[in-house]
Structures are given as structure tokens and as C-alpha cells.
């Protein structure tokens, strides 16, 4: 597997099999490695994975990022690779980026798939997301944050304490 950087220092992988590509957008605090099971499944198809701004090996460009920055990042990668049409899959914040991209650049899309997206978060939910981003910036393993969010302390103390997020999602 060969990973590359484009002119904007976006870290990506393009598996070009001369078919309509699938572009995968990961969630906050993760990187393109979260798509390993899907990469294996789609290895005979064209696909692109990439690290969002400030994630994985793609650096932050600005101290305060907006949805527009993430949407422009995807647009720049698509243009850099000269892709005219593709299937887009987003997970979590990747879904929000995919929605924003679709609203601006619908002519690029063959299909749009949203996984674990959100809609009309409360003020408390928005603050929780900001808190998770701040924790991720401090290098707290995202799997620990997710486990604490998904399971009670009692459950984690008694059951499956050996599991991490990668083993739970089959990575």
C-alpha cells in the first residue's frame, strides 16, 4: 500500500483500479486507518482514503478550522487526482463533511452514504463534541474516549476490559 501527499500536504491513499472510486471520510480523532476492513473488502475497486486536516499525517492549516476548510480539503484532493465522479462515504464528522460537500458539488457524486451522522445537536451535545476534540488534541487514545462514551464504568470494570475500539470494529 502506497500513501502519498498532495500539493497541500493532504495524506491520502488512492487505489486506482479504473472504476468509479469510493472516497471514505473518517470521524474526528481518527485517521484513514479506520477504513482498513473496508479497504480490504474493496481492494479490487478504486477507492481513496485520506486524513482530515489535523488528523493522522495531515497537518492543521489554521488554528480554527471550519466545515468549509474540510469541504475544500476534499474538493482539492478530488481535483488534484482529477476525479470527475465518485461514491462518497462519511462516518461521524465525515458524514457532516460529506453532506456539506454534496450541497456544494453534487455533480461529482454518484452516491452518498452517511454513517453515524448527527442532526440538530443540543448545546450539551455540541459541547461534548468540542470536549472530545480537545481530548483528542491532547493525544488521549480515541478508543478509550469512545469506550467511555459507549459503555458505563461498571460495564467496563466487569466485562470486556481487554477490548479496544479497533478490536471491537474488527480492525
Question: For each predicted feature, which ranges?
Answer:
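Conserved HGGG/HGGXW glycine-rich cap/lid loop of the alpha/beta-hydrolase fold
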Residues: 14-59
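Short, well-ordered alpha-helices that flank and scaffold nucleotide-derived cofactor binding pockets
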Residues: 37-40, 76, 103-107
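Gly/Ala-rich beta-loop-alpha elbow adjacent to hydrolase catalytic centers
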Residues: 90, 94, 98
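Flexible "cap/lid" loop of the alpha/beta hydrolase fold
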Residues: 99-104, 109-139
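Conserved alpha/beta-hydrolase catalytic His-Asp/Glu region
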Residues: 123-128, 138-163
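Single conserved hydrophobic/aromatic residue that forms the stacking wall/gate
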Residues: 162-171
